[in-house]
Amino acid sequence: DEAFLDVTNPKIPIKYATTIAKFIKRDILMETGLNSSAGVSYNKFLAKLASDYNKPNGFTVIRQEDAQEFLDKLPIEKFFGIGKVTSKTMKRMGIKNGYDLRQLSLYELEKIFKSKGYQYYNFARGIDNRPVEPYRERKSVGSEITLDHNYRLDEEEVVDILDELCLDVSNRIKYLNKLGKTVTLKIKFEDFTQITRSTSLNSGISSHEDIRTNIYNLLRNIDDNNLQIRLLGVTLSNLIDVEETYHNITLFEYMQSKD
């Protein structure tokens, strides 16, 4: 999981922003025993790059006066928003880093990459005016784990781990007072190939038992191709508020629930 935190209102000097980030890293370690990475900068794009820079336990600050030099040296595949396919296209064009990208005009980038060209033009210059949106509606609730060692699909431990993930998702979605209508199982194999399998339901669920039942049904139809598992994930999506179900229930269903 990751999140953005805007500490620019009121204006906070960057030294205090870094202190906040360090406190968050410390609290995560104390509460969970897990390391985390944090990045501090003056916009979302650069903060994201900073947080990714020295994972899994990094802390990077990109100041405004240092941003252009940082971006110019950054390999193009490390740019947030530039995926594997686009980075390969850029490398074929001779664009290997941020400096190379910055040599192309806005017209050239939009001609090649259409609407994305404007974003690439700005990112190469450290420009990102997107606001932090702290109140975005959550679209899914998920839990996943990278295993301490690889397991075969038919090992009992796989079922036990999935059971724990289902319980975690159930507890979190209940806390949000939500229900999910789509259940997704995610598996990453030892060769780093990844598959997801989903099932959509007529009504929302949140209970541990309901989530587990659907996940186990999905698991039965997985072909592992004799590969062992290194990561498991469970997600509930297509979320609705619990209150919405009260408005859709019929009188007959309501009377049945009272019996």
Region roles according to the model:
Residues K88-I229, L239-M255:
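DNA-contacting surface of Y-family translesion DNA polymerases
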Residues E2-L147:
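Nucleic-acid-contacting surfaces of polymerase cores and analogous helical-repeat interfaces
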Residues N9-K11, Y42-A47, K188-F192, S237-V242:
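Short, internal active-site loops enriched in acidic
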